[in-house]
């Protein structure tokens, strides 16, 4: 059986890993063992943060919607409640974009929500009294 020499493969593996680690500070970009540890951690951070990014954006959208809603005299939770009651199916990403870039359209949506909440409030009180 022929002898297998792995030097070429090993060098390619190390070269690839060090290329991945380029841009890291100090030994983490130059020494194989340190670079390997850092690349492994970096991949874990990337994986985790790709999932965290979804929540971060949702949080940002909610803050923008809340600011726009309060500028129009309604709180975030009343706005969302009113939109659900009115049957408006616009997601938070679009609402946040409207709140930032198209204040008139956002104000119209807020009025829809306000009317739905007011109608539900009067309807609910009348049904409880009867």
UniProtKB/Swiss-Prot annotation:
<dbReference type="Pfam" id="PF00453">
    <property type="entry name" value="Ribosomal_L20"/>
</dbReference>
<dbReference type="GO" id="GO:0019843">
    <property type="term" value="F:rRNA binding"/>
</dbReference>
<keyword id="KW-0699">rRNA-binding</keyword>
<dbReference type="InterPro" id="IPR049946">
    <property type="entry name" value="RIBOSOMAL_L20_CS"/>
</dbReference>
<comment type="similarity">
    <text>Belongs to the bacterial ribosomal protein bL20 family.</text>
</comment>
<dbReference type="GO" id="GO:0000027">
    <property type="term" value="P:ribosomal large subunit assembly"/>
</dbReference>
<dbReference type="GO" id="GO:0005840">
    <property type="term" value="C:ribosome"/>
</dbReference>
<keyword id="KW-0687">Ribonucleoprotein</keyword>
<dbReference type="GO" id="GO:0003735">
    <property type="term" value="F:structural constituent of ribosome"/>
</dbReference>
<dbReference type="InterPro" id="IPR005813">
    <property type="entry name" value="Ribosomal_bL20"/>
</dbReference>
<dbReference type="InterPro" id="IPR035566">
    <property type="entry name" value="Ribosomal_protein_bL20_C"/>
</dbReference>
<protein>
    <recommendedName>
        <fullName>Large ribosomal subunit protein bL20</fullName>
    </recommendedName>
</protein>
<comment type="function">
    <text>Binds directly to 23S ribosomal RNA and is necessary for the in vitro assembly process of the 50S ribosomal subunit. It is not involved in the protein synthesizing functions of that subunit.</text>
</comment>
<dbReference type="GO" id="GO:1990904">
    <property type="term" value="C:ribonucleoprotein complex"/>
</dbReference>
<keyword id="KW-0694">RNA-binding</keyword>
<keyword id="KW-0689">Ribosomal protein</keyword>
<dbReference type="GO" id="GO:0006412">
    <property type="term" value="P:translation"/>
</dbReference>
